[in-house]
Amino acid sequence: MAKIIKVIGREIMDSRGNPTVEAEVHLEGGFVGMAAAPSGASTGSREALELRDGDKARYLGKGVLKAVDNVNGPIREALLGKDATAQAELDGIMIALDGTENKDKLGANAILAVSLAAAKAAAAAKGIPLYAHIAELNGTPGQYSMPVPMMNILNGGEHADNNVDIQEFMVQPVSAKSFREALRMGAEIFHNLKKVLKAKGLNTAVGDEGGFAPNLASNADALAVIKEAVEAAGYKLGTDVTLALDCAASEFYKDGQYDLSGEGKVFSSNGFSDFLKSLTEQYPIVSIEDGLDESDWEGWAYQTQILGDKVQLVGDDLFVTNTKILSRGIEQGIANSILIKFNQIGSLTETLAAIRMAKEAGYTAVISHRSGETEDATIADLAVGTAAGQIKTGSLCRSDRVAKYNQLLRIEEQLGEKAPYRGLTEINAKG
């Protein structure tokens, strides 16, 4: 038994200069796990609650001392003496202790930090890497793959202070034979994009996730400069590299319409889906995330009908890593992929359940960071340990993003051929 003897919570800083929760779980034998909760900017209304203090005199109300107190108080008391390898039991205890639908009593940030720290401590006690422990918890021991990175090299929306409405423009290095090669391809495209933007007299400052954030005349212009960068790097768009979008459409959904204020266009629900379809006909866009508002289920049905057989349609705000909402989507044939964010649901056990449900239904699962991150690289181990096949963890700068890429490099070095990089096959795995 990997007995828990100490649980510690503390307030640390995230990549946007806001506080977040870090937890340590100590076991008999000197084993320790430490993890931090991330934080989102564009958030779904049905996400588990991130508990903030609300004291405007301290961190502008964004302090997390209440959540930290919950770690050091009731959560600690409930978990002392428990077996850290019994992840489902630990998470169940914390969920029951909270007793609310969205974890608003203890805070999803408090529960998640402890949940992940316990998993890390358990892996240490078992003498195995975290990804191997996650694979065992997932019921898929020894089944690994290296994820295709969806690299957010141009930022807009809530992630940048510019006029681009679509939140993320991503490249996927699909012709690579390994993750290491994919990362190199992405880095070369990133550096070439900087040159392309500079040559056009455009801003090369970066957004929350490390992508460039220039002002552009239209969303199509963003795709055009990325195409130029891909070709300048010596790669062929559509063969070596494919494109992905995160529209985060809930952020510009107003009064039943989709308002692209950056380019002065307003669309109906079906009209915006038709607009996205036209972009996929001009560029090799193989994945679109949150192409409509989280509440626009009728519109999602239309978008799935016109794009679902050709494009990976990812539900982020739509599904919020929640099996209840995902099961409704599966039943109605809405989208064909789910974005997986630990802190949307608030525990490792519930996260694994969402990944399993998606895969069993023929949906793909894309593991994701948040725009507010720390140096914690747990999502890298999650992606490999569940063989999810795809990961979103930002651009090729900002150490909070690169930490995840570097952890994936280490894991690939350890696993070698046991963790294949499958490229476009992963994206085409949708049902």
From Swiss-Prot:
Organism domain of life: Bacteria
Cofactor: Mg(2+)
Keyword Magnesium: yes
Alphabetical list of PANTHER family matching this protein: ENOLASE (PTHR11902:SF1)
SUPFAM superfamilies xref list: Enolase C-terminal domain-like, Enolase N-terminal domain-like
Entry EC no(s): 4.2.1.11
HAMAP family: Enolase (MF_00318)
Binding positions ((2R)-2-phosphoglycerate): Q167, K341, R370, S371, K392
Keyword annotations of the record: Cytoplasm, Glycolysis, Lyase, Magnesium, Metal-binding, Secreted
Cofactor binding note: Binds a second Mg(2+) ion via substrate during catalysis.
Subunit structure: Component of the RNA degradosome, a multiprotein complex involved in RNA processing and mRNA degradation.
Pathway(s) of this molecule: Carbohydrate degradation; glycolysis; pyruvate from D-glyceraldehyde 3-phosphate: step 4/5
Reactions it catalyzes: (2R)-2-phosphoglycerate = phosphoenolpyruvate + H2O
UniProt-annotated binding residues for Mg(2+): D246, E289, D316
Similarity comment text for this entry: Belongs to the enolase family.
GO cellular component, one term: phosphopyruvate hydratase complex
Role played: Catalyzes the reversible conversion of 2-phosphoglycerate (2-PG) into phosphoenolpyruvate (PEP). It is essential for the degradation of carbohydrates via glycolysis.
Presence of keyword Phosphoprotein: no
Active site: E209 (proton donor), K341 (proton acceptor)
UniProt-recorded name of the protein: Enolase
